Amino acid sequence: MKRTVTKSIAIIGEGETEWFYFDSLRVACRYPFKVAPDFPQHSDINHILKLVESYLNKQYDFIVCLFDMDRLYQYPSEMQLYQRAKKEYNKKKYAGKVMFVETNPCTEFWFLLHFLPNVVCRRYESYEQLLPELQKYMPGYEKTKRYFIRTNLYKYLTENGDLERVMSNSEKLCQLCQKSPEDLKAYSEIHKVIKLLNEIKK
């Protein structure tokens, strides 16, 4: 009988939003990954890169790092460090082990894409600018631990929104943004993580 080899995956998020979303996805879909750090907190780029090295040393098969680009655009020194690290982990020796996943401005844009019927190029400078739009579809949404504990994010988004739509819209937006990155349009690469998880689960 063929033994199934479980791949080890660490998903590293900057804050509570990412932690609660991916933890709710992990439970709903029974994915065998770890969401890190263990206790959600706002982490700077240095802390995230230390976690990457820690999981590489532990021989994890895949390490996914989630980044809100609005924060990096605010702090040029962090952006420089981010770009250097991204270039380094793109090298052959890491063989696709480390994945940097961007959302501009923040993870909430990925949530919003579950509800938008068409691919629309928008520009949001910040979470605050995006929030009123998201609250049309997620009334009462707030970036607080209390809200996240009360609301199963993955379940709410897939039951009230459309997962196929968000995957498709997200991919198309990333393609459009590659053509004109200077426009700083809103986009999310989280579809890459969902694809990876689906492939590993097969």
What are these model-predicted stretches?
Residues 31, 41-46:
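Eukaryotic endosomal/vacuolar membrane-trafficking regulators centered on PX-domain-mediated PI3P pathways
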Residues 8-12:
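Conserved beta-strand elements of the Class I
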Residues 1-6, 19-37, 50-58, 62, ...:
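C-terminal accessory helical subdomains adjacent to catalytic cores in phosphodiester-
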Residues 13, 67:
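Short beta-strand/turn micro-motifs composed of small residues
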Residues 14-18:
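Short glycine-enriched loops at secondary-structure junctions
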